[in-house]
A protein has these predicted regions:
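Conserved, short, structured surface segments that act as functional micro-motifs
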Residues: 120, 124-129, 143, 153-228
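A short, hydrophobic/aromatic-rich structural module that often spans a beta strand
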Residues: 130-141, 157-160, 164-166, 231-243
Length: 343
């Protein structure tokens, strides 16, 4: 019986749960300039005033640290992270309102619609769940004028699900755009975490943006165009690690149960802790058993930098050089991914 159990455990470690499927990605609108020599025709700009100079950089519509410039020991760096991409409209009516239809980027199922613009900075938005064989991924379509799909509805790649708009915080008609993300979900019990840390009402159940971690969807589109057989796992594996946090082990992590690619090493063995690897945006890249004994979440690696780590980690870390510790924001983030809020 013991031998049989060991065999089952070994099989669980080496046999994938499901074969990865082709992504079949399509752009969500008629704007395809992301693949051209003129990306400024694809991305929507933001207004900027830095050191007395006003500008409208289209680059601020890209994914990554592209906003809120600061002059530091490393020079001028952008310190505000943008989780997705902002796509310009290609059609407007006489009043300047966008006419672009918004389409599903891949086959999936609608799992959330937010039809009241005041309930989120996203304005009116849609979340579609996709299963490519590597755990559930969630595309998010924000600042919509209209939503034409329903929760539970199956959608196909390229199928219209809404109409571009300018709902949500800080957006006017001139800057109307589609904000697009592709995310993993941090924890399925997010509402409990939200209730513990925030007084504001959570209108979005587990599909709240704070529970979503977005990957670089622009880079994914470009690499997918070059290689239609690209897998999400191979894409994620190339994302560099910026920091690692080791947490006391109190059972399997919720995120590791849903995303087999995140599990590194023997998760069925005994260890004192989990070491979680993150990108600079806080995107979880790996969960590895660790024999390091910790009584609280501890930063065990950080990429050295001359400026504050807070500028490079969405405020999750503080410190400089090769030294870092969690901020209060970081402690909340780690509580969510580790599930310590459930204790």
């Amino acid at each position: 019986m013991r031998y049989f159990t060991k065999v089952l455990l070994l099989l669980a470690l080496i046999v994938p749960l499901k074969a990865e499927q082709p992504l079949g990605l399509k752009l969500p609108t008629a704007n395809d300039k992301i693949f051209s020599a003129n990306p400024e025709q694809f991305y929507m700009y933001t207004t900027r005033n830095f050191e007395g100079v006003s500008s409208k950089p289209w680059t601020a519509g890209q994914y990554g640290y592209v906003r809120n410039l600061k002059r530091t020991d490393e020079g001028v760096i952008a310190t505000r992270f943008h989780e997705g991409i902002d796509i310009r409209p290609v059609k407007r009516d006489k009043a300047g309102r966008p006419l672009d239809l918004v389409n599903a980027i891949a086959d999936g199922k609608v799992v959330h619609t937010s039809k009241v613009s005041g309930h989120s900075n996203y304005g009116k938005y849609i979340v579609v769940e996709h299963d490519w064989g590597s755990g559930p991924f969630y595309s998010l379509y924000a600042h919509l004028n209209d939503i034409t799909c329903k929760v539970g509805q199956k959608v196909h790649s390229g199928m219209p699900i809404g109409k571009m708009g300018y709902t949500g915080a800080g957006i006017n008609r001139e800057r109307a755009h589609l904000h697009l993300e592709l995310n993993v979900m941090t924890h399925t019990e997010y509402p409990k975490w939200h209730a513990q840390y925030f007084k504001s009402k959570n209108y979005h159940d587990k599909f709240n943006g704070l529970n979503m971690n977005g990957l670089n969807i622009a880079e994914l589109y470009i690499r997918h165009q070059r290689n239609p057989n690209l897998s999400l796992i191979s894409f994620i594996q190339k994302v560099p690690v910026y920091f690692k946090v080791t947490v006391p082990r109190r059972g399997a992590l919720d995120i590791a149960k849903r995303y087999p690619w995140i599990r590194i090493g023997n998760h069925h063995g005994i260890s004192a802790a989990w070491e979680i690897s993150f990108s600079s945006s806080g995107f979880p890249l790996a969960v590895t058993p660790s024999n390091r004994a910790v009584i609280r979440p501890t930063v065990t690696y950080v990429k050295p930098t001359k400026s504050s780590h807070s500028y490079h980690t969405k405020g999750i870390l503080t410190g400089t050089g090769s030294q870092a510790s969690l901020t209060s924001v970081g402690e909340r983030v780690i509580a969510l991914i580790s599930g310590s809020f459930m204790e």
